[in-house]
C-alpha cells in the first residue's frame, strides 16, 4: 500500500474524520520514521518495531488519538513516549501547520525515557523538517515536566497502570488527555479521553487497545 491509498482507506473506514487530521496525515511521510528494513511496508496499517522492544504505532491508532484530542492550531501539546517521532510530527502539522505563519504556531513537546529512542526521534524529526515545531526531551514523561505554562493537550503512547497525577496537574482548564490504561501485556487496555473542567476530571472510554507498557515512576517500571 502507498501513502495515498493508506489515507483513503483510513477515511473510508471512518478513522480519519476531519480535514485537519487528513491534511496532517498527507503531509507527514511515515517512511521517514521507520527503520530502513521496514520502509517497503511503511504504509501498511500495522505497528512496526523500532528496537528496544518498542514500536511505532499503526497509523489508524495515531489518527484515532489525534481525532479524539480535538487538536487546534496554536495549542501546546505534550506527548509522552516519542517512539520514532512520527506521531509528534502528525500533531505538529495541526498545531503548527507548515503552511501557516510561525507567529500562529503552537508546539509539541515529546518526552522519551529511552535515550536511544529520544536521539532517534530527534534525528528523524530534524531530517523531516520539524525541529522548530517539535522539541524532544529525554526524561520520564510519566512524571511530567516543569513547564512555565499548562498544556492544552497530552497524548500518552504507552499503557499506564493508572492516569499519572502529574499529567493531570499539567493540563490547562479545558484541556484533554488521551491515554491507554490497563495491563502491561497486549490485552486488557482501554483508551481513555480525560477532560479537565475546573476541579472536575471527566473520563470517557474510547476503545480497547494494545500498547507497549509505559516506563517510569507512574508506569510499569
UniProtKB/Swiss-Prot annotation:
Keywords: Cytoplasm, Methyltransferase, S-adenosyl-L-methionine, Transferase. Coiled coil: none annotated. One of its GO terms (cellular component) is cytoplasm. It holds the Pfam family PCMT. One of its GO terms (biological process) is protein repair. It is an enzyme of class 2 (transferase). It catalyses: [protein]-L-isoaspartate + S-adenosyl-L-methionine = [protein]-L-isoaspartate alpha-methyl ester + S-adenosyl-L-homocysteine. Its EC number is 2.1.1.77. It is found in: Cytoplasm. The active site is at residue 57. One of its GO terms (molecular function) is protein-L-isoaspartate (D-aspartate) O-methyltransferase activity. The keyword Nucleotide-binding does not apply. Catalyzes the methyl esterification of L-isoaspartyl residues in peptides and proteins that result from spontaneous decomposition of normal L-aspartyl and L-asparaginyl residues. It plays a role in the repair and/or degradation of damaged proteins. Belongs to the methyltransferase superfamily. L-isoaspartyl/D-aspartyl protein methyltransferase family. This is Protein-L-isoaspartate O-methyltransferase. It comes from Korarchaeum cryptofilum (strain OPF8).
Amino acid at each position: 500500500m502507498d501513502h495515498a491509498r493508506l489515507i483513503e482507506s483510513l477515511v473510508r473506514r471512518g478513522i480519519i474524520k476531519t480535514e485537519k487530521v487528513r491534511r496532517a496525515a498527507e503531509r507527514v511521510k511515515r517512511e521517514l520514521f521507520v527503520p530502513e528494513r521496514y520502509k517497503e511496508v511503511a504504509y501498511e496499517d500495522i505497528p512496526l518495531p523500532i528496537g528496544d522492544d518498542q514500536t511505532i504505532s499503526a497509523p489508524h491508532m495515531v489518527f484515532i488519538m489525534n481525532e479524539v484530542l480535538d487538536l487546534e492550531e496554536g495549542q501546546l501539546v505534550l506527548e509522552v513516549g516519542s517512539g520514532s517521532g512520527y506521531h509528534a510530527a502528525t500533531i505538529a502539522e495541526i498545531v503548527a501547520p507548515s503552511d501557516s505563519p510561525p507567529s500562529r504556531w503552537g508546539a509539541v513537546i515529546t518526552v522519551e525515557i529511552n535515550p536511544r529512542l529520544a536521539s532517534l526521534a530527534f534525528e528523524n524529526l530534524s531530517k523531516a523538517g520539524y525541529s522548530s515545531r517539535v522539541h524532544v526531551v529525554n526524561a520520564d514523561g510519566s512524571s511530567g515536566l516543569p513547564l512555565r505554562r499548562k498544556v492544552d493537550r497530552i497524548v500518552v503512547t504507552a499503557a499506564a497502570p493508572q492516569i499519572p497525577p502529574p499529567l493531570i496537574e499539567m493540563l490547562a482548564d479545558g484541556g484533554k488527555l488521551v491515554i491507554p490504561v490497563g495491563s502491561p501485556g497486549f490485552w486488557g487496555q482501554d483508551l481513555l479521553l480525560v477532560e479537565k473542567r475546573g476541579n472536575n476530571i471527566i473520563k470517557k472510554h474510547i476503545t480497547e487497545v494494545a500498547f507497549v507498557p509505559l516506563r517510569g515512576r507512574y508506569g510499569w517500571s
